[in-house]
Every structure is written in C-alpha cells, then in structure tokens.
C-alpha cells in the first residue's frame, strides 16, 4: 500500500499533539484533508486511536479497496462522520466503509465542495435524503473505471481526476468529459 507524504506527516503530527495534550480529541479535515485525518487516526497506535472521540471528514475522497480491510481503519469506522453535499464529486472518489451524511448546499456543481456553501440551522447542518443523480452517476462510473485498472493506473487516474475537479475547470458533471484545459 502506497502512503503519500501528507498522510505520513499527519500521522506524525497527531502523535506529536497527543504527546503534549493529555485529553480526548476530535480530528477533522476537508477534501484531501478529510482523507488525511481518517488515515492519520486509523494508522496510529491503539492508545492514540482510543483517545480520538470522532473523526470528521468533510467531503474527502475515500481509500483503495485494499485499505478497507486494514484493522486500524476498520476499528475507527464507528468514529468517522463523513459529510458530503448532495451533488458531491470529490467525496465520490474511491471507497469507504462508513456511511455518508448528505448535507444541503446552496451552490451547484463543484461549487458545492466549498463547506461555506453547506446550509446550517442553529448548530446542525441541513440534511438531504439522497445524492443527486449526477453524483450517483459519477460514483458508479468511477467504480467501473477503477475495477478494470491495475494499481498504478488507478493511482494515476485518481490523482488526475482530483486535480481536474479541483482545478476550477469543472463546474458541472459534463465538464469532466470535456475539460476546458483539453479544448
């Protein structure tokens, strides 16, 4: 399993913080930071994982199929709260075991990735009953593409897709098929 540098750094940072802070903690991240937060907690020693009350993943991509059977990851699944907007794109990349919590965004397309567009009432995010058809289409398409690829091709494809979705050239699903950068 390939570990990206930011994941290793986050794991070390979490360990360093918990050496000086004695209490329980909540760990959180948005986008790639959400993936990194989940990784850091899951790959830490059990004594550290036990001090983490919850891991908040705000529309971070998931993990490879192989990672889903990692004992550290499996042990923290009940602690993970993954939030995605109803038209999620980034959060549909790769796989996860934890259920997603779908929240209402006042934006469309990739602009829903901005957590400041997620609607709240009081102290709660407004929930939506389901993902949009476009988000579900992206999820199914990615699963089909990834299933037919070798490990190195999957890594390249996921990195390229993430870069494309976060480049600003994608506003709606159709832009993925015809990115402005390729025209």
Regions found by a protein language model. Name each.
Residues 28-33, 37:
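Gly/Ala-rich beta-loop-alpha elbow adjacent to hydrolase catalytic centers
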Residues 37-46:
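Short glycine-enriched nucleophile-adjacent loop
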